[in-house]
Amino acid sequence: MANILRTVIKIITCIALVICPMPEQKCEPEFDGTFLQSWMSAYWDDERWQEEIDVMKEAGIKYLIIQDVASKSTNGDWTVYYHSDLEVFEGADFSANDVVESALRNCDGSGIKVMIGLGLFDNWWNKSGFGDEYSELCDVCSDMIAEIHENYVKEYPDAFYGWYFTPEMSNGPLVKLSSPFIAKGINKVIDAIEKTDASAPLLLSPYFSQFGANPEIESAKIFWTSFLSRVDFRSQDIFCPQDAVGAGWVFEENLPNIWRMYSDAVKQSGKDIHLWANCENFTSPSFKSNTSGLTTPFPTENTEYVTATLDRFVRQMEIASHYAENIITFSYNHYYSPVYTDPMFHETYLDYLENGHVLESEAPTAPTALAFSTDSDGNTVLGWQASSDNIGVAYYRVCADGKFVARSEYWQENAVTIADAQSGTVYSIVAYDAAGNPSAAAEITF
């Protein structure tokens, strides 16, 4: 079903591009900013910060967006990632390190500017702007802006760039119906920014879902045009949609239509704001359920969160570059940093930059020594010797008579369990490197 829908969307997109070609590129197909979740950096010491900053600079990163530095759980408890004296945070769980201070101090003088994410509440996902909780959050965010500006930004003014409004809007029905309340809350936050450093931009990063109750792109354009017109945006503010490919809410084939929609919405809103792109460099796992393809994404081959190989990531950035002024990503630190993950992804990206946005094309060698065995539970196991590559192998893809069976990531064993193996079945294994180059297939018959 997913492949059929992809094909239909691809045909529609091709026709649309013939009628209305993509505009000329507005930026290079590369990212210069990244999101970093506060929980991840909460235990970084200065040495780790400097390691991350060094590799971010190698990758050309200029903007570091710290995600929510205060988060409210469904039971009302707060987790706060900076030293705050706000009454609302009394009794909160404070992180081991002050993320705001650490980010600003370590980035000071590095050439990387920090955007600070404000508050978030877990009930956003099932309430959106309805009820008192959202309005109260915006009040808290306004107080956070004043406090953080006074205690941190004034000390590190050259490292600070702006603010990130963390609740993630979408084209879902709850967001649409409560959008007047959401806009009112954002206006409150902008007022707070104006009272501190009026030149500081506010960044929003919503997403589009082609699943659920309102999957039509034209409907989304009407919504975003109306919503953007309601917010008191200033010329420095940034509308930076997630492309939602990594999370599975969008097919890659649909990206030209979606970015055209966002571009049109900004133009038709009458707001003089910046359109950036948040291109996702990961793939979320999604499992088969009764809602797959209806309200939730289709199942994925990967069963864990994985780094997207650079071929897909580059295609995302190339499309976005025709509509967006600038590209950032979620998340270099989580999925591409050699300090946190395998260096092959960082090295492949650097090679891409150094070679003028051309992907390296050397394929891995084919897996060898394929063999079947039986584990202690009596399951059939297919194992193999690892492939080699000039930079690194990201994963292996296993098929049975041409149909997908399993995927093995670079950190996993070179073996997969075969359910209900049948005599005469031909199993094939293909290795993929960090650029997405496939090896020749290695085969074995059961």
Regions found by a protein language model. Give the residues of each.
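Aromatic-lined substrate-binding rim segments of carbohydrate-active enzymes
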Residues: 49-58, 62-123, 179-202, 254-257
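An active-site-proximal structural segment forming one wall of the substrate-binding cleft
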Residues: 95-110, 131-162, 220-232, 320
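Aromatic-lined carbohydrate-recognition surfaces of secreted/lumenal glycan-active proteins
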Residues: 115-125, 161-168, 186-221, 239-245, ...
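Active-site groove signature of glycoside hydrolases
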Residues: 119-121, 145-178
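Substrate-binding cleft of secreted/luminal carbohydrate-active enzymes
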Residues: 236, 240-251, 265-359
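Pro/Thr/Ser/Gly-rich low-complexity, intrinsically disordered linker/stalk tracts
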Residues: 355-391, 436-446
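Solvent-exposed loop/turn segments flanking beta-strands in beta-repeat/beta-sandwich domains
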Residues: 387-401
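Beta-strand-rich modules
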Residues: 418-437
